[in-house]
Curated annotation (Swiss-Prot):
According to some authors, RPEL1 is a RPE retrogene on chromosome 2 which is likely to be functional. NCBIfam families: PRK05581.1-4. A divalent metal cation binds at residues 35, 37, 70, 175. This is Ribulose-phosphate 3-epimerase-like protein 1. One of its GO terms (biological process) is pentose-phosphate shunt, non-oxidative branch. Pathway: Carbohydrate degradation. Keywords: Carbohydrate metabolism, Cobalt, Iron, Isomerase, Manganese, Metal-binding, Zinc. SUPFAM superfamilies: Ribulose-phoshate binding barrel. It comes from the Eukaryota. Homodimer. Its cofactor is Fe(2+); Mn(2+); Zn(2+); Co(2+). It comes from Homo sapiens.
Length: 228
């Protein structure tokens, strides 16, 4: 059974000129992992960074931090090997970006990374189901991918609930517009991993925000288990 409540800051809205220092601050503040958004300007209109930055972060931060790569790219097959060489831990690709998810899943595993599979708000969760037993994590987008600081889409929660019901041992991640006023909705629906960007990154005390999110998430998850 997927357990615990892991909080992963998204560095999308951080100062990219001081990215290493900001990531270190997040880890020192109690982050369970780092959520790194890779955008190519094709799959989504924005552009962020690629594997050279990930490789630099690994050298600066050491081997312990878990890098969850959210690959918002139109050719996810192209970047598996470079991200593996850069020592990414998990390669999360979008179901909408490939015609051969099974082949891509196999390639990611053969390159030594965990597999995440993401779906946009407009994609039915049932399309993810055939691959759920072959992946480590399902990412349910709660905003349209591509930019930070969007409003949380509560109508995505039935997707999370359906996945948790159908695949109880699967890690499920909510990503987009998640803060202290919305994290409980993700956890109550069944998410055990939460990505939060602005709520953490813009805070003068990120440790307190991370702890608050984790506590709210844990309480909501406990409530969910009692309500069964």
């Amino acid at each position: 059974m997927a357990s615990g409540c892991k909080i992963g800051p998204s560095i999308l809205n951080s100062d990219l000129a001081n990215l290493g220092a900001k990531c270190l601050q997040m880890l020192d503040s109690g982050a369970d992992y780092l959520h790194l958004d890779v955008m190519d300007g094709h799959f989504v209109p924005n552009i962020t960074f690629g594997h050279p930055v990930v490789e630099s972060l690994r050298k600066q931060l050491g081997q312990d931090p878990f890098f969850d790569m959210h690959m918002m790219v139109s050719k996810p097959e192209q970047w598996v090997k470079p991200m593996a060489v850069a020592e990414a831990n998990q390669y999360t690709f979008h179901l909408e970006a490939t015609e051969n998810p099974g082949t891509l899943i196999k390639d990611i595993r053969e390159n030594g990374m965990k597999v995440g599979l993401a779906i946009k708000p407009g994609t039915s969760v049932e399309y993810l189901a055939p691959w759920a037993n072959q992946i480590d994590m399902a990412l349910v987008m709660t905003v349209e991918p591509g930019f930070g600081e969007q409003k949380f889409m509560e109508d995505m929660m039935p997707k999370v609930h359906w996945l948790r019901t159908q695949f109880p041992s699967l890690d499920i991640e909510g990503d987009g517009g998640v803060g202290s006023d919305t994290v409980h909705k993700c956890a109550e629906a069944g998410a055990n991993m939460t990505v939060s960007g602005s709520a953490i990154m813009r805070s003068e005390d990120p440790r307190s925000v991370i702890n608050l999110l984790r506590n709210i998430c844990s309480e909501a998850a406990q409530k969910r288990s009692l309500d069964r």
